[in-house]
Amino acid sequence: MDRTEPDDELLQTIVTQTAGCGSILLAYSGGLDSSVLLHLLVTVRQRSGQTIRAAYIHHGLNPLADSWAEHCRQQCERWQVPFSSLAVTVEAQNGGIEAAARTARYQALQVHLKEGETLLTAQHLDDQSETFLLALKRGSGPAGLSAMAANSFLGHHRLVRPLLGFSRLQLEAYAQRHQLRWIEDDSNQDERFDRNFLRRQILPRLTQRWPHFPSAVARSAELCAEQEQLLDELLEESLRTLRQPDGALSIDGLVPLSPVRRFALLRRWLAQQGATMPARDQLQRLWDEVAASRRDAEPILQLNQMQIRRFRQHLYLLPLMPSLKDRVLPWQPTSCPLSLPDNLGTLLLADSGVAVRAPKNGETVSIRFSTSGTVHIVGRAHGRQIKKLWQELGVPPWWRDRTPLLFYNEQLIAAVGRFVTREGQVREHQPLWHIVWERN
């Protein structure tokens, strides 16, 4: 492929940004930006020795998506780049269709990445300005105003955006010099979407008045990112002290801190666990309604597809969990293991472990996840209400209706892995079972 002098800066940036990347997966939409990036990668491939693959994400949102995927396939075939088209389902949540599509896109790419492979995406300088202004509109702090990082991670894989220092005009000029063909997505004209409105109505006027506006925004984003990195370093030791081996966060350790420091630590705790960054009012609710609620409460705060719970003066970030209270699972343990719902694992008979009496003739076996009333367990003289018993055994509230309960007819025999009731106790010369819960 021919090279001209104006290409040198772009090519050198690609070489520098992808140094050490033996294998690369390009997120390839067929648009201008990713078409330029693919051409650049193919240009430097001969001397770099890098392995390049490309993946098109089929969102199913545009009737032309099939033809776009075919365009991408043909272009990759021409340049001898292995190609995949990945179909995703976009389910709009509170963040809207744009955010949902982005989430689905990155999830698909993360699954598609091979061991040791680096993901490249083609966002440019103007995209950075849009991202910054959208964060400003939301009232984001330095983390949000950091916009997009040139180097970050997607799971355990490096994520590199090598074109962030170049404008769309520069990429367009490159594409025209090399007579590239690319797709124009008609949805990019729809100004109902905030990003398109900024791109078409706001940024051109700002750049016309102040030509260096995108570069200035990029510098501000970098400064915000530096401030966030500094805070990460300064708060690292405090967070390590407050965080427990199971990921829970100590509430008592947060109480004496100033609200500013407390919220900074909460944000970093959530970020470390992969949660979407909460708005300021959500952080305040987290503290007021969950952390600082009365001691006997069992508060819950939903944060997108996660929930924050409190137990024994610690905060836990958990996935949303469907209730299993009404589930009744018939079981014949001697015939086969029992697969539990919601990926909870398997129950099976074993040669060792906690023993319960085998059922008598006429007793049917079932697994349930809820019971009520007073329970008498082996090793205790007096019965306890089941809620009190769970508390005394240190079982977190979210496990109390997800722990398999063994019933014979309507009689509670055991909470598998937790306790055996007097009704399930093995008497002398009685046949017995060892039931084991293998969790996923």
UniProtKB/Swiss-Prot annotation:
Pfam families listed in its UniProt record: ATP_bind_3, TilS, TilS_C
Primary role: Ligates lysine onto the cytidine present at position 34 of the AUA codon-specific tRNA(Ile) that contains the anticodon CAU, in an ATP-dependent manner. Cytidine is converted to lysidine, thus changing the amino acid specificity of the tRNA from methionine to isoleucine.
EC number: 6.3.4.19
GO cellular component, one term: cytoplasm
PANTHER family: TRNA(ILE)-LYSIDINE SYNTHASE-RELATED
The keyword Ligase is assigned to this record: yes
Catalytic activity annotation: cytidine(34) in tRNA(Ile2) + L-lysine + ATP = lysidine(34) in tRNA(Ile2) + AMP + diphosphate + H(+)
Subcellular localization(s) per the UniProt record: Cytoplasm
Keywords of this entry: ATP-binding, Cytoplasm, Ligase, Nucleotide-binding, tRNA processing
Binding site for ATP: 29-34
Organism (species): Pectobacterium atrosepticum (strain SCRI 1043 / ATCC BAA-672) (Erwinia carotovora subsp. atroseptica)
Name of the molecule in the record: tRNA(Ile)-lysidine synthase
GO biological process entries: tRNA modification
Primary localization: cytoplasm
Family: Belongs to the tRNA(Ile)-lysidine synthase family.
InterPro entries: Lysidine-tRNA-synth_C (IPR012796), Rossmann-like_a/b/a_fold (IPR014729), TilS/TtcA_N (IPR011063), tRNA_Ile_lys_synt (IPR012094), tRNA_Ile_lys_synt_N (IPR012795), tRNA_Ile_lys_synt_subst-bd (IPR015262)
HAMAP family associated with the record: tRNA_Ile_lys_synt (MF_01161)
